[in-house]
A protein has these predicted regions:
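Surface-exposed beta-strand edges and their flanking turn/coil or helix-capping segments
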Residues: 23-26, 46, 55-56, 108-111, ...
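Solvent-exposed beta-strand/loop surfaces of large extracellular or lumenal domains
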Residues: 146-165, 268-302
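N-terminal start-of-chain detector that recognizes signal peptides
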Residues: 69, 92-97, 106-108, 200-204, ...
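Short amphipathic alpha-helical surface micro-motifs
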Residues: 1, 21, 76-81, 103-106, ...
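Accessory, solvent-exposed terminal regions and/or long lumenal/extracellular loops of proteins
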Residues: 172-274, 283, 295-299, 304-311, ...
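Residues in intrinsically disordered, low-complexity segments of regulatory proteins
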Residues: 30, 55, 142-145, 210, ...
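Catalytic-domain carbohydrate-binding cleft regions of carbohydrate-active enzymes
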Residues: 1-167, 172-173
């Protein structure tokens, strides 16, 4: 994270080491699990014994290596938006905890945890043969365990989580907005997200900018990019305002929003002025094009709907409202989730 603090956000290491003997299997897996969060992710080497360090050399752990790399690709919309933020503000992508939590003296000497962008705390396993990992959660907000149904912890404490070789300890920050590809991307250059899954954790009022362009040319300098501002506010009634601008037409056909709320269940969900259908059966929800479902296990609302900004004649106009609600080069729509108290028996 030191390079990011020094104004070079696109940092990264040669995964597995560039020279010298190949690392043992466990070390290589853990190295990849860390590397997938580095803006510059590269597995290559020139070993002194005329070998190379590549994933296919570790056949017993190939699935774990593949899983970590696929996670990186699913998080591509989040990473690309962080790259855009870095280009505009200089903000690091891999962030030392002290960058975000300067009022917590406990993070001043923390060297092995970091934030991936603003919202994801990563605590890679760094001890061989480890079965647990102690994680310090910075004070000032709540944290939600990515790997354990968003189990919630107060900040300002050290917790201990169980780990196996496949585990990458990750925690979402209260107020998080994390976009991911619904479809599995296999290439940053050739593949595009045809669906977006956005995980949100209401708490503090929050604004996030989701950025996209063609990823290849400099046409973004001519305005061929799309910036979608996502504004989340409210507690009993959470409103998420989407407002997009730009000339670039993305590929997103389907939207999915996952909203975590541990202390209350949802009452109703609306997209614009339309109240969405509530599905009690997960399979029926999965088969539907639009609606919402509540996971008792995660304590999270899952909302899905076709991207309302899709224009059949012009590809996809971005996350937005139906065509009559277009503004110049952009669209707006509001997703509302009610966590208000409700009376089932009319008393």
């Amino acid at each position: 994270t030191g390079m990011g603090l020094s104004g070079q956000p696109n940092e990264g290491a040669d995964i597995g080491g560039f020279a010298g003997p190949a690392p043992d299997e466990e070390l290589f897996v853990r190295w990849v699990q860390n590397g997938v969060f580095q803006p510059r992710f590269s597995i290559h080497s020139a070993s002194n014994d005329n070998t190379v360090t590549e994933p296919w050399m570790y056949r017993d752990s190939a699935d774990l290596i593949r899983s970590a790399i696929l996670l990186r690709y699913r998080l591509a919309p989040y990473l690309y938006s962080a790259e855009y933020e870095a280009s505009q503000t200089g903000a690091p992508i891999m962030r030392a905890l002290v960058y975000e939590f300067q009022n917590d003296p406990n993070v001043y000497d923390e060297s092995f945890e970091f934030l991936y962008g603003r919202d994801i705390l990563v605590a890679n396993v760094i001890e061989p043969g480890a079965t647990t990992r102690k994680v310090y959660l910075p004070a000032g907000c709540k944290w939600y365990d990515w790997n354990n149904n968003f189990a919630c912890y107060e900040g300002g404490q050290t917790i201990e989580v169980p780990v196996t070789l496949e585990t990458i300890p990750m925690f979402l920050r209260e107020g998080a907005i994390v976009p991911m590809a619904l479809n599995q991307l296999m290439s940053m250059e050739r593949d595009h997200a045809t669906g977006l899954h956005i995980t949100m954790v209401p708490g503090e009022e929050r604004t996030y900018v989701l950025y996209d362009d063609d990823g290849v040319t400099n046409d973004y300098k001519k305005g061929l990019c799309r910036k979608t501002t996502i504004h989340m506010s409210g507690t009993d009634v959470v409103k998420v305002d989407f407002s997009s601008e730009g000339e670039y037409t993305d590929f997103v056909k389907d939207m999915e929003v996952e909203m975590v709320r541990k202390d209350r269940s949802p009452f109703w969900v609306a997209l614009g002025d339309e109240k969405l259908e509530h599905f009690l059966n997960r399979r029926k929800f999965d088969a539907a094009a639009k609606g919402w479902y509540y996971s008792q296990t995660k304590k999270a609302v899952l909302v899905k709907y076709p991207n309302p900004g899709r224009d059949i004649n012009h590809g996809i106009a971005g996350i937005g409202q139906p065509q009559e609600s277009k503004t110049e080069n952009g669209m707006q729509i509001t997703l509302t989730v009610s966590f208000e108290d409700f009376d089932l028996i009319g008393m």
